[in-house]
Amino acid sequence: MGKRATTSVRREELNRGAWTDHEDKILRDYITTHGEGKWSTLPNQAGLKRCGKSCRLRWKNYLRPGIKRGNISSDEEELIIRLHNLLGNRWSLIAGRLPGRTDNEIKNHWNSNLRKRLPKTQTKQPKRIKHSTNNENNVCVIRTKAIRCSKTLLFSDLSLQKKSSTSPLPLKEQEMDQGGSSLMGDLEFDFDRIHSEFHFPDLMDFDGLDCGNVTSLVSSNEILGELVPAQGNLDLNRPFTSCHHRGDDEDWLRDFTC
């Protein structure tokens, strides 16, 4: 179960260890005639008592045409050192920059010869550079967490007190800026008593006007301007004396006619 029908050589019967010249000739002749093909079936078709992985490595690293074996020059060694500082232990990439050299041969030459010549600090340089780049990346990805405000405090009373305490204007000018409402806002009038003691028909007759609501056009300060003294104190026991004449009232009412 699980074994291929075309496999005629058992695992116990496979040859292990070094390749002989006869095995090299069989493998070279078969691949030259039929091509590489599928490495798992190639040993049985070529008549070799080897596994597919062993045949592949023997061909790629030793028997393939154009391969250089041994005698690595000083220029190649210098190039291997520079590429190793840049790429690290990526032997297949380093072998691609050296025509005719295999990754297995370059790795063996590095571990057996070049690594012992170089100081330890230079051989560990790629790891240190990689560690520093990781630290820089860790610093870049740090982000601040936004804080969400759920409550808002209003200090309107405190701001008004501070504004009034730090305002350079005098008290009278501040009251004038507020529209003069503070001068009349503190006074309380008994209009029923004023109407009973003073005769407003002597001043003007609002019933005879056809212009609508005239009182909406005239403020209380204008109507009672002559009744209230400048100090804001009203003496209700003082008899009323009219300052207007009949002719002045007619001229004044004529201005409000529609």
UniProtKB/Swiss-Prot annotation:
One of its GO terms (molecular function) is DNA binding. It comes from Arabidopsis thaliana. One of its GO terms (biological process) is flavonoid biosynthetic process. PROSITE patterns: HTH_MYB. InterPro entries: Homeodomain-like_sf, Myb_dom, Myb_TF_plants, SANT/Myb. GO terms for cellular component: nucleus. Residues 39-63, 91-114 bind DNA. PANTHER family: MYB-RELATED PROTEIN MYB4-LIKE, TRANSCRIPTION FACTOR MYB8-RELATED-RELATED. Interacts with BHLH2/EGL3/MYC146, BHLH12/MYC1 and BHLH42/TT8. Coiled coil: none annotated. CDD domains: SANT. Expressed at a high level in immature siliques and at a lower level in flowers. Undetected in young seedlings, roots, leaves and inflorescence stems. This is Transcription factor TT2. SMART domains: SANT. Gene3D superfamilies: Homeodomain-like (1.10.10.60). Disulfide bonds: none annotated. TT2 activity is tightly linked to the presence of TT8. Residues 11-63, 64-118 form the HTH myb-type domain. Pfam families: Myb_DNA-binding. Keywords: Activator, ATP-binding, DNA-binding, Flavonoid biosynthesis, Nucleotide-binding, Nucleus, Repeat, Transcription, Transcription regulation. Transcription activator, when associated with BHLH2/EGL3/MYC146, BHLH12/MYC1, or BHLH42/TT8. Involved in the control of flavonoid late metabolism in developing siliques. Plays a key role in determining the tissue-specific activation of leucoanthocyanidin reductase (BANYULS). ATP binds at G47, L48, K49, R50, C51, G52, K53, S54.
